[in-house]
């Protein structure tokens, strides 16, 4: 609803109104704490990822090639936080990986370009992305230092949504940055697409990645998603266990990201639309697209 209202405003006014809305929403949720989660890091031999919480529930990610110290930032909606992390880690930020055009993901791009003082390549799959200077499409490839990046086109939440699949030089360390397509235990709303498109994104593309691929999503929605997953599959013990794990993490103000592709296949109803237990919930046994449509519609109004 709020996005429809803002879309009727002139571009500059729309951006200002959207920024004010998300800032106010963040203050309402987080108060004087400032942020919804503590910062955290995932460090491997070739790749480091610094998890940078932003706004009321967003995540930005600073990706570092440990061999070259070249870095990229995913969805830098809070440029000051990004620059502070870059300076703290002493890395060479070269690129911005934008998953989609929504303000809470791409709204900081132009300010980051202005503040940073060095040229940055801004990747993305949608001309509506602020600061975009390198448009990408499905299967496009580039590098972050020695790390290999492959673009996965996942239209549905938005028509130009891109996920970024990253591998170490040897291919043994793998991660995917999924924006608002795939969440821990859930998926994004179908704002600009269809159930067929989300099925293609989740089942035909992302689920085909190696099971040990780490999944870094765009929001801290885990407990709400898992609660819904338990509603869909009340006998799913993997979901129940993940709920308890997530409660412990959130009680400590820690992020629940990353998950893995293997985990999502066990706990995420939107990744399980080919499973009979999920199809039965939707009264659509043998029909995964109808199941996807139904469980998304119910989730949109689930409390």
Q: PLM features: what roles do these ranges have?
A:
Residues 186-212:
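Active-site-adjacent loop/tail segments of enzyme domains
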Residues 76-77, 101, 127, 157-158, ...:
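Active-site metal-binding loops of divalent metal-dependent hydrolases
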Residues 2-39, 203-214, 221-303:
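Accessory terminal helices/loops
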Residues 63, 75, 100, 112, ...:
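Divalent metal-coordination and catalytic microenvironments
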Residues 56, 71, 78-153, 167, ...:
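Active-site HxH/HxHxD metal-binding segment of metal-dependent hydrolases
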Residues 45, 145-150, 160-162:
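Short beta-strand or tight-loop elements
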Residues 33-92, 164-178:
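Conserved beta-strand hairpin/beta-sheet module of binuclear metal-dependent hydrolase folds
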Residues 132-133, 185-191, 225:
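A short acidic, helix-capping loop that chelates divalent metal ions and anchors anionic groups
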